[in-house]
Amino acid sequence: YRTAGSVAETATGDMLYREMKAIGLTDVTRDTFSLDGWEFEKAVLKFTDDSGQEHTFQMGGYQTNFETDGFEDYELVYLGKGTAADYEGINVKGKLVMVEINQRDEWWISFPVYQAYLRGAAALIAVQANGYGEIAESALNAQDIAGPDFAPAFSLSQADARILKRSLRNKISACEDNTTDSEDTHNTPEQDAALLRRFSLKVSLDARSRVIPDTT
């Protein structure tokens, strides 16, 4: 992302200044001001399914702090809409929590993100179910976080989330030898959470997202 206060945005401003001077403009200035900057370099999630196929998901980011030293291993759990009730009886300490939210019609991402932080999760991964996610199943969203930078969050597409949820359903089938309910792809997030919340997936995450307070 080339956001305000980032190295890329500063370099772009310098380039425009040089180009304007080069074409002969004379009243050209570079003015500085202070703001909270954000450097988002990457957020790559890797997952190997039960058949041995490796999936690589490119995620989007929000204005929060989260950095790994290359790929680091995590457990990933799915908790519906990420409400307080969805966490009942589930230990998410140090885990990645994936939720499906509708920021347009329900609530902003800051609420499930802070809930995940209070529960000790490593980060929240938001999937836009309807609302801002209606443009395409492969779309990544990144709005203003409207929350603290120490409660990290990422964005995952509906298409990629479906692969992870399918693997969680396969775990239910393997454990309970019952595929009828677990294969229902028309479940609401609440119904899916009730089925899938007891299981987790092993994933790897390589991410670098850094908020830079009061930069110029």
Q: Which residues fall in each region the model found?
A:
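A conserved hydrophobic secondary-structure block that centers on an alpha-helix together
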Residues: 84-91, 95-133
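General beta-strand structural signal in soluble alpha/beta enzymes
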Residues: 30, 79, 99, 126, ...
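Extracytoplasmic/secreted cell-surface and envelope-processing proteins
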Residues: 14, 37-41, 106-110, 132-139
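Soluble metallo-hydrolase cores and metallopeptidase-like ectodomains found primarily
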Residues: 56-89, 143-216
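Sec/Tat-exported extracytoplasmic proteins
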Residues: 1-5, 16, 21-27, 101, ...
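Extracytoplasmic/secreted proteins, especially bacterial periplasmic and envelope-associated proteins
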Residues: 11-19, 111, 115, 120, ...
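Noncatalytic luminal/extracellular "stalk/propeptide" segments of secretory-pathway proteins
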Residues: 1-96, 103, 182
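Short low-complexity, flexible loop/linker segments enriched in glycine and/or proline
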Residues: 43-46, 137-147
